Amino acid sequence: MLPRAVVLLSLTPFFAQAACPDWPVPRATDEITALQQQLQRWDSSYYRDGRSLVADELYDQARQRLLTWRQCFPQAPRAMDQPLLGAGGSIRHPIPHTGVEKLADANAVTGWLKGRDDIWAQPKVDGVAVTLIYHRGQFQQALSRGDGVHGHDWTRAAWQIEAIPKRLPRPVDLLLQGELYLRLEQHVQARSGSLKARNRVAGWMARKQLTAAEAAQIGLFVWDWPQGPATLSERLEQLADLGFAEPREYSRPVGGFADAQQWRARWYRSPLPFASDGIILRQSRRPAAERWQAKAPYWIAAWKYPYAQVLASVRQVDFRIGRTGRITPLLEIEPVTLDDRQIRRVSLGSLQRWRSLDIVPGDQVAISLAGLSIPRLDEVVLRSTLRQSIQPPREADFHFLSCWQPSPGCEEQFLARLTWLSSKQGLNLQNIGSRTWARLVETGRIKGLLDWLTLDQAELANIAGFGDRSSKRLLESLHSARQQPFPRWLKALGIPPSGSADLSGPWQALAMKNSLDWQNEAGIGAERAAQLVAFFRAPEVLALQGALNSAGIEGF
């Protein structure tokens, strides 16, 4: 578990183009203070208790956001930023734990590698850092990382962990730095993420008593031998001889950027026995241990895996009304990139979820991809200090029988009805989508769901964008609807789901059914039956049935 604060050194250029918020100074002061306080809470839990309350990648982005806001508003008061305050334990490390510089992207990695030789790559194991001390080959003490200078005594728990050798093959004095991790089988980071593995180990180590079952799940990855041989290859071989073989298995020489990229991709997508969140690049040779300090050195750097989550600022909250009257909150966000995709909006699914999350413009939220393709909101990371009042559409005003005309407030649901009508689930009208329907509605050519049945060439000729060729193609597609069978027309009009009921018609036969008749059909319960009865009796639907009857559509 390496310190987080050093991320700013390498991420600053990457975010240099971030836009400044349009805030007056008092608002900026409030927002900066709120973000700094949140970071302090995370730091306290991470360094003092060993528990991570937020994903590292979100922490990194939040800390970079703080830096950006401070640069945008230099006149805002600035509090002292001390991430490691209160993190230290009571025991001084014989040799400090260094930090690690985090490289933001491929360009940063290329720059770091330039002019260096004898570089090695290792997985950046996602666990908790520990110092192990041996005297004459006997295990003597284990210390938590703490603030890098002072740590807590973990010796009692360490005696329970089988992965920590208690007696070495040779009577040597030894100080090692490494990672205690949760053992995982065939763990693929790209697929499963970190599974809160670090939190579990940190929680176990913080207890007064570690159970045998918990101890058996903890592994050890030694990533440094400060007073060991001069080169990493020598250190790896001698560590293996002493019983610490895992570092040798997961250390690979890097000849240039292509090698680093290859190992990063392989360890991200291949099975490993632990969670990892990137790769470590380290020079084989480094200064004497007496010169080490608790800060990021020049001889180690981290290249994190692609973001699984990004921090996004909410621009506004919109509400989409669908064909059935369902109201879906949508967050318009400052554009962010995930898996090479730019994301500008994300759905919250339901009004209930939006209300429970209480999201307003200015909130900072975590976004990921569900199934590697669909943007998903994971959590609210930081709430704006200005809580705007947002009034969503009234749920009672929208339902499966509302908005059959584009009257004020009904435009969106009505357009959704038209789009459904021409879709593959409806009449399957070629070359007709929401944009075409919107243009016809905006120009007043369509004021009801079936007005398009009487459209002609002359009417289309007066609409910008409809030339002779496109008008002819549109009319041919609309005319093809007349040959569609009765059941497809019912679905196009928006009949509620009807299970496996026979919808072959005619209309009158279906309209005569009562609730019990519908419930006798497979897959239809009382609630759905009531909706079907209401559909066939609704005045607006009866008007559509009359229009289709007059147009000679079969079944009506």
Curated annotation (Swiss-Prot):
Sum up the protein's function in the record's words.
Catalyzes the formation of phosphodiester linkages between 5'-phosphoryl and 3'-hydroxyl groups in double-stranded DNA using NAD as a coenzyme and as the energy source for the reaction.
Keywords for the protein's UniProt record, in alphabetical order: DNA damage, DNA repair, DNA replication, Ligase, NAD
Q: Which domain of life is it from?
A: Bacteria
Biological process GO terms, please? DNA repair; DNA replication
Protein name (Swiss-Prot/TrEMBL): DNA ligase B
Q: Which reaction does it catalyse?
A: NAD(+) + (deoxyribonucleotide)n-3'-hydroxyl + 5'-phospho-(deoxyribonucleotide)m = (deoxyribonucleotide)n+m + AMP + beta-nicotinamide D-nucleotide
Entry-linked SMART domains: LIGANc
Give TM segment ranges: none
- Key word RNA-binding present in the record? no
Q: Which organism is it from?
A: Pseudomonas fluorescens (strain ATCC BAA-477 / NRRL B-23932 / Pf-5)
Ranked from the top, the taxonomy reads: Bacteria, Pseudomonadati, Pseudomonadota, Gammaproteobacteria, Pseudomonadales
Query: Which SUPFAM superfamilies does the record cross-reference, listed alphabetically?
Result: DNA ligase/mRNA capping enzyme, catalytic domain, Nucleic acid-binding proteins, RuvA domain 2-like
* One Pfam family from the record: DNA_ligase_aden
Q: What class of enzyme is it?
A: ligase
List the EC numbers from the record: 6.5.1.2
Keyword Cytoplasm assigned to the entry: answer is: no
What is the active site of this protein?
Answer: 124
Q: Which residues form the signal peptide?
A: none
Matches recorded under PANTHER family:
DNA LIGASE, DNA LIGASE B
The family database entries (InterPro entries) matched by this protein are listed as: DNA_ligase, DNA_ligase_B, DNAligase_adenylation, DNAligase_N, NA-bd_OB-fold, NAD_dep_DNA_ligaseB, NAD_DNA_ligase_OB, RuvA_2-like
Q: Which family does it belong to?
A: Belongs to the NAD-dependent DNA ligase family. LigB subfamily.
Gene3D superfamilies assigned? 5' to 3' exonuclease, C-terminal subdomain (1.10.150.20), DNA ligase/mRNA capping enzyme (3.30.470.30), Helix hairpin bin (1.10.287.610), Nucleic acid-binding proteins (2.40.50.140)
The Gene Ontology terms for molecular function here are: DNA ligase (NAD+) activity
